[in-house]
């Protein structure tokens, strides 16, 4: 049912954003991380690319049904058949559990090396206040940029919103200039400058894209 898919997305994306917000403010406000909050935020963040892929597929399905003359609101709540040959691939029901699990985990997302490297840089930024110390004027800015870069990079794993990775360019520019505004040690300058350049450079490769997304293919760059 389309409404169920949209409800799933509405539950995942906003709740994921709230969890990430708590992770951003915790070290700044209370000076430490919460293990349970980190686990919850990681679980929600990993679901965001899958939720976005499902929402896009649902919207495209509703558009196709509307163009076919079906009332989209009725289709939204009751469902409908889609375009196609109507043939059933019986071999799909005979696959091994491992193959099915792999298809479930890789459906709608790919793992380009550039985004995986961006995730690594983001985690490095989030942990950098541990050696920069929270007394450093730039520590909070580095931590926030790391959390935002992690969110952007994980979300961009969804092929249909791969262009979202270019938000890391903005984060990279902020990192490069943050120590100049707030001040900091030489180590802080080097950390921000290196991480900023890495984030900007890693946005260039798009990486492989799996599947076809209809009209959205033109936006996958």
Annotated model-derived regions:
Residues 1-6, 155-167, 208-209:
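Membrane-helix interface "capping/anchor" motifs
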Residues 141-148, 190-200, 217-221:
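Short amphipathic alpha-helical linker/capping segments at the junctions of internal repeats
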Residues 114, 118-134, 148-149, 153-156, ...:
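Extracellular/lumenal glycan-associated surfaces
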